Amino acid sequence: MADSPVDSSPAPETSNGTPPSNGTSPSNESSPPTPPSSPPPSSISAPPPDISASFSPPPAPPTQETSPPTSPSSSPPVVANPSPQTPENPSPPAPEGSTPVTPPAPPQTPSNQSPERPTPPSPGANDDRNRTNGGNNNRDGSTPSPPSSGNRTSGDGGSPSPPRSISPPQNSGDSDSSSGNHPQANIGLIIGVLVGAGLLLLLAVCICICCNRKKKKKSPQVNHMHYYNNNPYGGAPSGNGGYYKGTPQDHVVNMAGQGGGNWGPQQPVSGPHSDASNLTGRTAIPSPQAATLGHNQSTFTYDELSIATEGFAQSNLLGQGGFGYVHKGVLPSGKEVAVKSLKLGSGQGEREFQAEVDIISRVHHRHLVSLVGYCISGGQRLLVYEFIPNNTLEFHLHGKGRPVLDWPTRVKIALGSARGLAYLHEDCHPRIIHRDIKAANILLDFSFETKVADFGLAKLSQDNYTHVSTRVMGTFGYLAPEYASSGKLSDKSDVFSFGVMLLELITGRPPLDLTGEMEDSLVDWARPLCLKAAQDGDYNQLADPRLELNYSHQEMVQMASCAAAAIRHSARRRPKMSQIVRALEGDMSMDDLSEGTRPGQSTYLSPGSVSSEYDASSYTADMKKFKKLALENKEYQSSEYGGTSEYGLNPSASSSEEMNRGSMKRNPQL
């Protein structure tokens, strides 16, 4: 009796414990009674063994068939409970150790605690669903998944494990990808915003730079004094005296001794003659900018220029004139410049200085001297220009002991000068009249490329209007007839002066001989010879004897024809500078240049050419008066062109202020 109950007691224990452990056959026997019997206990007892059996038994086919009936029977109360367990079980297998924790739970309380344990996992499952975006879990095992998973595990241990192990990584991968896409999209958005902001910032910086440049271009116009006042070659009277009028230091030393050995190195700046107007070398920065109108000059302090010129040392003196001095200087960058100091009390106002600096800053051409900068320090006003190292045409053509310029070099100089003047007359808007064209204002580099200098006093002429100057601008011998008679200047006045310079290149003679060796001016002497040469084609008598007939006949014809047309008395009959350029280049016939007049009917000799503006006899008389006036002027004789000058030829003198010292009053015709 006692044994029977003992045997009966283990029987149910084994019934509870063995069916889950055995797995396949007992589960098949127990599965049919479960539907008729109470669904809650059977459903509860079934899932725990399924979980434990998921790892041990491989067989699955019979269980898979039984799984569908279990799902409907347990669907109302159980689907929610086992479904969370099954997701817990697949999710823990991925981390590795959650599965061993689940098996002990069913043996502890198969009936009572089974409903309690499913409830806690449900929030965990919900958390897992929320964490893994839940959609994938529902897709893999929604309503059928919990029972099928349990049945599949019981019947097939190997097959369900891969999907379980795969499903969490898939879910995690999907969640990672979905969660990773958002940061990537955000990063791309941030990068795009940063790039756009950078571009906007760069655009703003560019706009600011452009605005600053425009402001700087306008600022140089605020400069004060007159720009080009000294004519170191003695042409100072012209007010814009040549910039470079005695370049080599040997030549400069001689000039210094001649002009006045008492000049101290600082006197040019401090004394009344202190401003040696300088066409100084342009610094590298302004020179390219000078190529365009509205160029920005560099500003210098007086101390900087004093250091550059070694205290305006006499050894650095390039030239002198009635309006000041030109000194050679070296900037800290190593660039050589010519510093022109303007003489105080020269009659130039700040507004005039501002206007002239603005004019020069707008002009840039390969055959024009460029402005580098300027300095205004108290009463001192200095201009800085590019330094042209090989002196002037006057120096090479008329200087004592200088080698003879060969013919190709003379043609090259004539053509370069013509191009520079044509640019001033026709390519600048408004056009610029030089008003002081002469050999002393033609600078040369070592390859004898031409740079036209000293056009700082040039006035802007508007359209076809001419202006009357109160000063005599230009050097004696270069003055146009209409200026001597009426004081009017135009671009055709520059053409006349250029014609005189062409005659210098052809003949090797100065425009006006103050030594008395040549009675007439160069123009009066050359006119009949030009007419004769045009008629018989023989230019030997007109050509410079130092050339020894080594010249091109065709080029001589072109140059002589241009000179003859340029020195016509009637300004209206003179060609434009652009026409002269074309003629010198050989692109225009001489008939076109002479406007159809035959050599025997040249306008400068024919009766009709004795225009109402001026006639040849009056011009000759006035030139003689100019010559007499120059000889009477002591200041002029003490200049570099005086009898003791290095040149010794007194080739150029000029200007108004010398003539306005009472001599003009004695000669009212002037």
Curated annotation (Swiss-Prot):
Glycans are attached at residues 22, 28, 130, 151. It is a single-pass membrane protein. ATP binds at residues 318-326, 340. Residues 208-670 are cytoplasmic. GO terms for biological process: protein autophosphorylation. It is an enzyme of class 2 (transferase). It catalyses: L-seryl-[protein] + ATP = O-phospho-L-seryl-[protein] + ADP + H(+); L-threonyl-[protein] + ATP = O-phospho-L-threonyl-[protein] + ADP + H(+). Mostly expressed in flower buds. This is Proline-rich receptor-like protein kinase PERK5.
